[in-house]
Curated annotation (Swiss-Prot):
Gene name in the database record: asr
Residues in the signal sequence: 1-21
NCBIfam families (UniProt xref): acid_shock_Asr
Biased composition (Basic residues): 80-90
Propeptide cleavage-removed residue intervals: 22-58
Native species: Escherichia coli O127:H6 (strain E2348/69 / EPEC)
Identification of the protein by name: Acid shock protein
Record localization: Periplasm
């Protein structure tokens, strides 16, 4: 396996060096007798920066779905009142509806 890898690397390096040598040998050097052309204008492209979002606390990011937690909590009752609310409820019996005199 190592031999195959070594052969592949050697072949790739050999091809790239041969291609580089061929490229440099065939490119003629520019002659100095040509007149200089005006340099091309370079255009500078400015990047458009987006406004940074407002920073939030980490807890606000995690719990943004719990909007119900901000509502007013119900009144707290004593523990005994919670347990015995049904036993000691003083409900008055329903009065019959007053009948109009006919």
């Amino acid at each position: 396996m190592k031999k195959v890898l070594a052969l592949v690397v050697a072949a790739a390096m050999g091809l790239s060096s041969a291609a580089f040598a061929a490229e440099t040998a065939t490119t003629p050097a520019p002659t100095a007798t040509t007149t200089k052309a005006a340099p091309a204008k370079t255009t500078h492209h400015k990047k458009q920066h987006k406004a940074a979002p407002a920073q939030k606390a980490q807890a606000a990011k995690k719990h943004h779905k719990n909007a119900k937690a901000e509502q007013k909590a119900p009144e707290q009752k004593a523990q005994a009142a919670k347990k015995h609310a049904r036993k000691h409820s003083h409900q008055q019996p329903a009065k019959p509806a007053a009948q109009p005199a006919a």
